[in-house]
Amino acid sequence: VAAWCVWQTWPSDASGMRHTAVVVEQLTWHEVTADNRPVLYFSSAEGDSALTGITSVRDSATHRRLTMGFWTNSLPLMPTCRGRVVAPYAAEGGVPRSLNDSAIVRLCRLSADIQLKRLQTQKSELDYYIRVHGVQDNGYQQIAALANSIKRAAIAVRTARNIIDSLAADKKHRHRFALCTKATFSVTGHDDEGKTVRIPMHLVSRDSTLRLAVLQTSDRSTPDWAKPAKLLPWDASTSRSVLSVATPGLGVHGIESDTVSPIIVQGTLQASGQHNLPRLRAPDGAPVYTRRGHFIGLVNGKQIVARREISKLLKK
């Protein structure tokens, strides 16, 4: 028993830390459903007065967010991961729940009409540029590609307008409309050979105060290469030097990637829970360790969420 306890409290080395950390991808979108079946998608809602970005193509309305996360056990001295990952959770705005059918149809039509007008204006401006410039001119190919993108967007919006008009005009069946938000999750890590591995996850629970979520693999199994964090029971919230493990650049459009191997970053933790880890190299969700390699929490803004709070989250 003593040997087992020593093994379970043994600190992680650099390789172990890297195999604890994962990149978490959260895809979120809003749906317009008819009789509980998705028919249209939109980017956001402005209260109960407007829907933004209505479209017939789900990918056009999907928000992608990359954060860090980590495999973790739920008990201090037992291998109790069962495929669970703790990571930040972001709700991409809410949707109004009290709108009746006619109000939803009206907002869908209004959103489509506003978009079509804007896209037509953009198309006219780009068509003029293409008419007066030659293929050899600097930037012509980029403008032509943008024009094609706007054309595709207009087709998707026009299709959305036709769909909602058709459903609303159906005299044989009175459709029930609703708005809802959907999200999918996956994690990306690296196995013992350094190969990139992507695993789909599902949401188990979330805490709105901490803005954290517990995710889990579909079969509740933990990959062989994963090294779950050990939530030791004693307090670790004292001023000290710390190490964080993260894929740099997450959250920065244009440079973020979920396939880059994580790096180890040094910083300091204050007794108040604040840290000085650089956000570019230690984004939200990055696991944090003592210099010796004991897990103590995760980065959440300018604070480090202590492992005792994570333990409470896993018990919900």
Show where each model-derived region lies.
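Ser/Thr/Pro/Gly-rich low-complexity linker/stalk segments immediately outside membranes or between
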Residues: Q8-A21
